[in-house]
């Protein structure tokens, strides 16, 4: 039997991201916040006081006393399996911030636990809920680009002091790897990467990656923690032109290939090559991606429907990120689906 609205929601881990989950749960019609937990008791108390809910230093006490229907797991990646399992065993449906886990084995274990407890597991790939990415997906699905040739994602910026347990690839690449899969509807078959460790003491902090998809497109990925200004760009190149998303401004642009005509290029147009056509900036409805994400999570639970970003989606993004890390270390092309269950 599905629960009824408003659902009781809780947040475990109220750091830089978890605090916003707490806020949004107080704003949604489908949910009300019943408690927060954090190993930093002072931090938990601060957020609990802000939203007028109980605060706990031990997440297990929160789960036992508040019995939430929904739980956001926003703890460090290395704790996702432990905390997520505790929440599932308490009867809660969970949204785990990306990446789903630090290893494929942990991610698989979390998915299996959700299956055994018959609870929803959603992974917080928030970029899918960016209004510009949603619009991009719509236009690509409508065939407005024709065949897709290339997807390029650039996610660079300064080093976030909050990150300690993983490198830039596992922290940031799952966002864009998931976007590439989501927008293209295609699956990567091999990757190659060059990584560098310039400032971070334990992990790589720069990656340049190539991803080849089963259907033919090539993905290019540039991520780092070294750029003094933040850039979040996605471009999708196809036979009729190019879409570009600026995720910071939530803008979507289309640059037309003036030589593309109808379903096929004529022989004359092919000889002329590609030329600049019109540029369109699409008017988009602005909304907060996190609010859309949590709303979709809550609604899936209420409707007893699959969540929009499954545990398998999160696991595939993690597999690809770890394959990029491996390629960066070995300087070899890594085939996906061959020997990566243990990564």
Describe the residue ranges of each PLM region.
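N-terminal Rossmann-like dinucleotide-binding module
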Residues: 1-51
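C-terminal capping/lid region of NAD(P)-dependent oxidoreductase domains
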Residues: 4, 119, 326-343
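Beta-loop-alpha module in the N-terminal Rossmann-like domain of NAD(P)-dependent dehydrogenases
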Residues: 21, 51-113
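Short, Asp-centered acidic motifs that coordinate Mg2+ and/or phosphate
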Residues: 35, 69-70, 150
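A contiguous active-site-proximal alpha/beta segment in oxidoreductase catalytic domains
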Residues: 95, 101-163
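C-terminal glycine/acidic-rich active-site capping loop/insertion
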Residues: 126, 240-312, 334-343
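Rossmann-like dinucleotide-binding domain that binds NAD(P)(H)
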Residues: 160-229, 235, 249, 312
């Amino acid at each position: 039997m599905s629960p009824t609205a408003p659902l009781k929601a809780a947040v475990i881990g109220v750091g830089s991201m978890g605090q916003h989950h707490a806020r949004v749960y107080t704003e949604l019609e489908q949910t009300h916040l019943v408690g927060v937990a954090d190993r930093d008791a002072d931090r938990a108390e601060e957020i609990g006081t802000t939203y007028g809910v109980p605060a706990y230093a031990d997440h297990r006490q929160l789960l036992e006393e508040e019995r939430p229907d929904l739980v956001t797991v926003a703890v460090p990646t290395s704790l996702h399996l432990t905390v997520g399992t505790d929440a599932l065993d308490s009867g809660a449906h969970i949204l785990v911030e990306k990446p789903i886990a630090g290893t494929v084995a942990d991610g698989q274990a979390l998915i299996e636990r959700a299956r055994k407890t018959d609870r929803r597991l959603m992974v917080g790939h928030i970029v899918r809920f960016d209004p510009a990415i949603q619009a991009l997906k719509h236009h690509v699905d409508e065939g407005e680009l024709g065949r897709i040739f290339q997807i390029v994602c650039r996610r660079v910026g300064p080093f976030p002091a909050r990150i300690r347990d993983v490198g830039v690839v596992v922290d940031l690449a799952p966002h864009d790897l998931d976007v590439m899969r989501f927008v293209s509807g295609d699956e990567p078959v091999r990757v190659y990467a060059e990584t560098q460790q310039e400032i971070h003491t334990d992990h790589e902090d720069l990656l340049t990656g190539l991803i080849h998809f089963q259907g033919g497109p090539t993905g290019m990925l540039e991520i780092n923690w070294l750029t003094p200004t933040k850039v979040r760009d996605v471009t999708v190149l196809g036979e009729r032109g190019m879409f570009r998303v600026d995720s910071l401004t939530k803008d979507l642009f289309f640059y037309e290939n003036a030589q593309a005509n109808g379903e096929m290029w004529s022989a004359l147009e092919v000889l002329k090559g590609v030329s600049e056509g019109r540029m369109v900036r699409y008017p988009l409805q602005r909304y907060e991606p996190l609010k859309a994400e949590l709303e979709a999570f809550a609604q899936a639970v209420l409707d007893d429907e699959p969540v929009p970003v499954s545990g398998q989606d999160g696991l595939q993004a993690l597999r690809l990120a770890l394959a990029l890390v491996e390629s960066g270390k070995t300087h070899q092309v890594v085939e996906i689906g061959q020997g990566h269950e243990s990564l």
